[in-house]
UniProtKB/Swiss-Prot annotation:
Keywords: ATP-binding, Coiled coil, Leucine-rich repeat, Nucleotide-binding, Plant defense, Repeat
Family stated for the protein in its record: Belongs to the disease resistance NB-LRR family. RPP13 subfamily.
GO molecular function: ADP binding; ATP binding
GO BP, one annotated term: defense response
Sequence ranges assigned to domain NB-ARC in this UniProt record: 142-446
Keyword Lipid biosynthesis included in the entry's annotation: no
Signal peptide: none
Gene name as annotated: RPP13L2
LRR repeats: 587-610, 612-634, 703-726, 749-774, 807-830
Transmembrane as UniProt keyword: no
Protein name: Putative disease resistance RPP13-like protein 2
Length: 847
């Protein structure tokens, strides 16, 4: 992994040499030499890792290289921080002015020469201790293959609940049993790690039958640091909006009573994943009412004494191991997918490896993912390396081999997963923005950095290191990290000072990134030495906080690239509530600022100082004042409700803009927004003095890369005198006063896959809409017109899968027999039977 970090730093030197050349006065040659030395060391680093050199000399040598790499990054970033501050004071534009005062240049020159000496010393140690001699037989690591992942994207890679079909049927019956047998109200799923307890519980939780049967459904995970009070508070918070401060004041017994009162007389399902303590289980029994409403509780546990209590109301379900046949079927589907000819020798090696997986699904799928990337002539080498370590294959060994098999960018992406909380549903778009902001992703000739990052994440899915939660149209939307994988990434990240997950027991850290889950209070700052070289600080959770905590942290962290404070509420005496601390304006290296759901209601002027900012995530917040972001030319993603005027300069890099008023939109230079992909425009009625500007298709059609468009305004027309075409638009949502649809909508929107219309149509839209060849999802809502009749002919909607029609006074809906052959869901608002339905029998089951 040290080679990945070193390669990352070498890439950073390259970026500085290319983009900041005018600022590197007198140091360019020395920096080039340093880069060359580090590049040469790369070869030895890779060999040390691939050959599994674990002797003390090799470990110490790699640590020296890691320290140098981090120090190089510190020297460069600190130097440019000083230059930025000086230019800001002088009021100069950085790229057009060369500093005449060479004081800082001399300082960095001394630092670089020191680093060069240290690098040469490390190189000499290679020869002195023979670290560079690698003649023994070894497994050759493959590089990450970004484009090869494309071939796997068409396949759904969600984790299969292998061998658990019968288990799921049995437990589903017990969940839905309404025959008055209320003796069983808690199901305990028991088994060792890697058997699929969580997968089985989640399959039950997400079952359509379960969703329909239970009024309330709650899923909570018991993390390592979680106590019984935390479990109770999480369940309560999932059920109702309750102040966290109020809950914290309650004793455990009071929380039990409070939760009991909430759920009394309710039909609920509560799942508590990975419970370890009998005391916590007894508390849940007291808090969760066992009533006659058919409510159920599911727990998963690896602790037998927790699973097998004496309570007759608890049904314990033991998960079995996979049979060899089940394990082999699971393995060969993935491992042999791209091998054209599987000979007997390859099958023999594969079966020997599968036999050693011990019937554990997790171990088997990770092994299959690893072998799917290997050429047939490499299989024996992998099997030999696994047998050397142990008679049995442990999943941690497979994680290690998979990790070594990755290219350096994929390694960085994989280890970065350690920032997310346990059982967290990772939003792929957010992760992509974070990876780009960290500088881990390089632009490709054919793809944006975001597209490259997405392929890396798909690669992690392909090799079974993450578990898919949601896809839309094959596009990965979210995933989860298995506990064992998360433990591996946290351990590796800590070893490399890459990421530190805050623990109350440790008061300081030397890691480049720190993440805080749930807690940020006096304990966090008390006697804590903050690492001033930190590049990222991320907070996950929801908490009302004194603004001074954030000020204290950010005041010391001048080199931050990523600052995620989503969920914090900034409150402090002497400050107006709901504002950001001024010290954030001094973080000139910042690429990602996350302030989602922080109740911030204005963006201070200092935001314009953050001119390298790529992502500003302010979703969940509304800004009524004018917001000037015209200096942020690197901005790629902007989210928040910008009610007041929003000023954006020549934002050619902007890809996401959600959401902007129609007035502000009219003031922008649309022709410059060449990379905009996702756009939301609203008409905010809160500002009476704001001029309402009608929207038209012409201005929007200039956005040649637009994929997603949402418009919520009164005055909007789909008609245009000019010929317009939205070649790449796949999703369109219109909430406006549209009376008619243009007959050539299929020509205007040739790629449209999802359409939502909340309008006041005066005629049947189906003759027009059914010509949209790629449409798969259609929602018509609140469309009122007299004598309303709709007709879909036999050739209509060839690809439509979901149709939802919520129309007042719809008199008649006729669908011909052969129409919509792909339809899977039909939702009609016809409970009172007022609409005459003339539809095929096959569709009546959907209604």
């Amino acid at each position: 992994m040290v080679d990945a970090i070193t390669e990352f730093v070498v890439g950073k030197i390259d970026n500085y040499l290319i983009e900041e050349a005018p600022m590197l006065i007198g140091v360019k040659d020395d920096l080039e030499e340093l880069k060359t030395e580090l590049t040469c060391i790369q070869v030895y680093l890779k060999n040390v890792e691939v050959c599994d050199k674990e002797d003390e000399v090799s470990k110490e040598w790699t640590k020296l290289v890691l320290d140098i790499a981090y120090d190089v990054e510190d020297v460069l970033d600190t130097y440019f921080l000083k230059l930025e501050k000086r230019l800001h004071r002088l009021g100069l534009m950085r790229l057009t002015n060369i500093i005449s005062d060479k004081k800082d240049a001399y300082n960095i020159l001394d630092d670089i020469k020191t680093l060069k000496r240290r690098t040469l010393d490390v190189t000499r140690k290679l020869e002195m201790y023979g670290i560079g001699n690698f003649n023994e037989h070894r497994v050759v690591a493959s590089t990450s293959r970004v484009r090869e992942v494309r071939r796997a994207r068409s396949d759904d890679q969600e984790e299969r609940v292998v061998g658990l079909t019968d288990d799921a049927k049995v437990l589903l019956t017990k969940l839905l049993d309404d025959d008055g047998d209320n003796k069983i109200y808690m199901i305990s799923i028991f088994g060792m790690e890697g058997l699929g307890k969580t997968s089985l519980a989640r399959k039950l939780f997400n079952s359509s039958d379960v969703k329909e049967s239970f009024e309330y459904r709650v899923w909570t995970n018991v993390s390592g640091e979680c106590n019984t009070r935390d479990i109770l508070m999480r369940i309560i918070s999932s059920l109702e909006e309750t102040s966290e401060g109020e809950l914290e004041k309650m004793a455990q017994q009071e929380l039990e009573v409070y939760l009991h009162d909430i759920l009394q007389e309710k039909r609920y399902l509560v799942v508590v994943d990975d419970i370890w303590e009998s005391e916590a289980l007894e508390s849940l029994k007291r808090a969760l009412p066992c009533s006659y409403q058919g409510s159920r509780v599911i727990i998963t546990t690896s602790i037998r004494v927790v699973a097998e209590g004496r309570d007759k109301r608890v049904y314990t379900h033991n998960i079995r191991f996979l049979t060899f046949k089940e394990s082999w079927n699971l393995f060969e589907k993935k491992a042999f997918r791209y091998i054209l000819k599987v000979d007997q020798e390859l099958q023999k090696i594969g079966k020997e490896m599968v036999q050693k997986c011990g019937g554990l699904p997790r171990t088997t799928v990770v092994l299959a993912g690893l072998m799917s990337r290997k050429k047939p002539n490499e299989w024996n080498d992998v099997w030999s390396s696994l047998r050397v370590k142990d008679d049995n294959i442990h999943v941690s060994s497979l994680f290690d081999l998979s990790f070594k098999d990755m290219g350096h960018e994929l390694k960085l992406c994989f280890l970065y997963l350690s920032v997310f909380p346990e059982d967290y549903e990772v939003d792929v778009e957010k992760l992509i923005q974070l990876l780009v902001a960290e500088g881990f992703i390089q632009e490709d000739e054919e793809m944006t950095m975001e597209d490259v990052a997405r392929y890396y994440i798909e690669d992690l899915v392909y090799i079974s290191l993450v578990e898919v939660v949601k896809r839309k149209k094959g596009k990965l939307m979210s995933f989860r990290i298995h506990d064992l994988v998360r433990e591996f990434t946290i351990k590796k990240s800590k070893e490399l000072n890459f990421v530190n997950v805050y623990d109350e027991q440790h008061s300081s850290t030397t890691s480049r990134r720190e993440v805080v889950h749930h807690l940020m209070d006096d304990n966090y700052l008390c006697d804590r030495r903050v690492n001033t070289q930190m590049r990222s600080f991320l907070f996950f959770g929801k908490r009302r906080n004194d603004i001074t905590y954030v000020e204290t942290i950010t005041l010391k962290l001048k080199l931050l690239r990523v600052l995620n404070l989503g969920g914090l509420h900034f409150i402090c005496q002497g400050y107006s509530p709901w504002s950001l601390p001024d010290v954030i304006g001094g973080l000139v290296h910042l690429r990602y600022l996350g302030i989602a759901d922080t109740v911030v209601n204005n963006l201070p002027d200092f935001i314009s100082n953050l001119r390298f900012l790529q992502t500003l995530d302010a979703s969940g917040n509304s800004f009524e004042r004018m917001t000037d972001l015209s200096n942020l030319t690197s901005l790629r993603h902007l989210t928040g409700r910008f009610i007041g005027e929003l000023l954006i300069g020549d934002a050619v890099n902007l890809q996401t803009l959600r959401s902007i008023s129609s007035y502000s939109w009219s003031k922008l230079k649309h022709e410059l927004l060449i990379n905009l992909r996702d756009l939301e425009i609203y008409e905010f009625h809160i500002l009476n003095d704001q001029i309402k500007v009608p929207l038209d298709l012409v201005s929007l059609s200039k956005l040649k890369n637009l994929r997603v468009l949402k418009i919520e305004v009164v005055s909007f027309s789909l008609f245009s005198e000019e010929t317009v075409r939205f070649e790449l638009l796949v999703k369109l949502t219109l909430h406006c006063d549209v009376r008619r649809l243009p007959r050539d909508m299929d020509l205007i929107f040739p790629s449209l896959e999802s359409l939502t219309l909340v309008t006041n149509l005066q005629e049947d839209p189906m003759p027009t809409l059914q010509k949209l060849q790629r449409l798969e999802n259609l929602v018509l809502y609140s469309c009122v017109y007299p004598g309303a009749k709709m007709f879909i002919n036999a050739q209509g909607f060839g690809r439509l899968r979901k149709l939802k029609v919520i129309i007042k006074r719809l008199d008649e809906l006729e669908i011909e027999e052969e129409a919509m052959p792909c339809l899977m869901k039909l939702n009609l608002d016809n409970k009172d039977g007022a609409t005459k339905l003339m539809i095929p029998d096959r569709m009546r089951a959907f209604v």
